[in-house]
Amino acid sequence: MNEQEFLAAMASADVIHDQAAIDAALDRMASELDALVGGGPIVYAVVLTGGLVVAGQLATRLRCELDFDYVHVSRYRGETQGSDRLDWICGPRLDWRDRDVVLVDDILDEGHTLSALIDAAHQRGARSVRLVTLCEKLHDRRVANLHADVVGLTVPDRFVFGYGMDAYERGRQLPGIYALAEG
């Protein structure tokens, strides 16, 4: 998608959540996560690239001690539908053995990527693994028994972007959550 096509898609996109709704959700998420993990320290692992915006904004609201880490995996590679293949671009840099790990991502959709990351965290010896997502998509296609421990907002079963989520690798920096026009 070139710049003109993205701007056209943006012009017809629906606003799902504005910045005020996101800020309120992040405040609530921080309180919930602080209550779940106590004082820390926790491994605060950002799921790149989508989780970057959310994790940064959420971190400034947390009171617990954070040891920052990141993982970079992808099933999408610029497409709107994920493949069955999980590409590990960069694994964690910290040792997760006997640590409480919190994975932070932009959205819980079907959950294949996040489920694989949770399994990988357990294989690396994590004492506990929590999942935090800004958004949870409302549908019935999720991986069985997968849920986020902390969720900020729900979004409809549409292609959403903004606040870390992209539409054809564009729009991650937008200060709201949008959905591509249907049809």
Locations of regions flagged by a protein language model:
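PRPP-associated nucleotide enzymes
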Residues: 1-183
